Amino acid sequence: SMEKISPNVDKKTGDRIREYNLPGVKVDEDFKRYYPYDRLASRVLGFTGSDNQGIIGLEVKYEDVLKGTNGKILTVTDARGIELEGVAEDRIEPVAGNTLKTSLDYNIQSYCEQAAEKVLEEKQAEGVSVLLMNPQNGEIYAMVNVPEFNLNEPYRLNDKTEDQMTDEERQNRLNQMWRNRCINDTYEPGSTFKIITSAACLEEGVVSLDDTFSCPGYRIVEDRKIRCHKVGGHGTETFVQGIENSCNPVFMDIGLRLGSERFCDYFEQFGLMSLTNIDLPGEAGTIMHKREDIKAVELAT
């Protein structure tokens, strides 16, 4: 019988073993995935393990599409594993895997990564994420999570204390390093959600473009003092100016006019309670208050 002694032997070692011409010892060639751009879009592309199976990202999502089928050579050997001469061998030809073309744009991805790296350094942040999408068709042109990792060395941690870690600690750090924060983590939308509030209120007719509001820099809602980002307030302004100023009191006022029921209806109609079904593993779901739990303060914030 045949026994595999060691997988993933480097080429130099394999060539030396061949030179010894040892009876019954055979070096089989294998293939390893190589990533020419090292860190580019590392968490999106993903990487393969020692058995060439996808581990994260597109590599694992499209494993069955990319992997193909191995070929085989069936021979007859003696008890020592040496092939018998004059005996016909059967060959099963390999079937190549398919090619996957992504919507990522190399230039846009590279530029976004450079910009994110600059912010990471300037702000001394733990991480910076950028997602650039074509809103007309949903194509992703760039998905950045810096610091990225080297796809050709995916098990190498950029941590000086790596040698002091337990196996469990090291695996946890690797899992965090491989995590695609753009889709695996949830985060508060902040003022970007004012777009949803504006659309819902305009559609329902609870506000018009020339409605006027007064912003003293805060609103008292029940027992909460909710501030605007401009401490002294924006004063008197129209709804359009309120949008331009991203004025919190304006949106608190129109949100209360809309009410929680209609607000939740539009939340669902915009698809915010559903997954996007992006073809990457581990998309996080929306975290939202239950309808019955949305009171004046929740609606205002």
Regions found by a protein language model. Give the residues of each.
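Extracytoplasmic/secreted envelope proteins and their assembly/folding machinery
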Residues: G14, R18, A41-L45, E59-E63, ...
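Small/polar-residue-rich segments within soluble enzyme cores
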Residues: S1-G97
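Short N-terminal helix-loop-first-beta-strand/juxtamembrane motif that initiates sensory/input modules
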Residues: P23-V27, E121-P135
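Short, glycine-anchored, charge-dense loop/turn motifs used at functional sites
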Residues: C112, V130-Y141
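Conserved, well-ordered alpha-helix/loop/beta-strand core segments that scaffold catalytic motifs
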Residues: M2-I5, E85-V128
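Extracellular/periplasmic catalytic domains that process cell-envelope and extracellular macromolecules
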Residues: Y34-D38, E93-P94, K123-Q124, N134-P135, ...
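Beta-lactam-recognizing serine transpeptidase/beta-lactamase-like catalytic domain environment
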Residues: D78-A88, Q136-S191, I196-T301
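Conserved short loop/turn motifs at secondary-structure junctions
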Residues: S1-S6, S129-V130, F251-R257
